[in-house]
């Protein structure tokens, strides 16, 4: 098993030095779900939520979240993102919305945290916009689905 990279030999937290790493194309895809009451799902699906276009605003929030990742995660490097794509999949039977984010950069470190943060912010925005009618929504199943590029190579979830 690999060692944790965000701690030095004395066990102190530090930001990893990526200065000598090659600049490569990096891609990460993350996903997560929010489950809600059938009535809440209908409001989201039909675009009838009191606060407006829930998924449109959640899409913009997810993109903004990806751009702010290094402000939120202490040892995360600031990145020049080259692409952030946000997709929502409505699951009528499960009364849920799946958010999938693909983040890309050309850089010296990966974009996994940006993709994961974007998913969480997108789902939290859905929660925020619908909480007046459903405080019991559940956010879950947030995970990295794949990462491409970099020294450690490609990885795809089982």
Curated annotation (Swiss-Prot):
The UniProt record lists the keyword Amino-acid biosynthesis: no
Molecular-function GO terms, alphabetical: cyclic pyranopterin monophosphate synthase activity
CDD domains: MoaC_PE
Pathway in which this enzyme or protein is active: Cofactor biosynthesis; molybdopterin biosynthesis
Keywords for this protein: Lyase, Molybdenum cofactor biosynthesis
GO BP terms: Mo-molybdopterin cofactor biosynthetic process
Function: Catalyzes the conversion of (8S)-3',8-cyclo-7,8-dihydroguanosine 5'-triphosphate to cyclic pyranopterin monophosphate (cPMP).
Protein name per UniProt: Cyclic pyranopterin monophosphate synthase
UniProt lineage: Bacteria, Pseudomonadati, Pseudomonadota, Betaproteobacteria, Burkholderiales
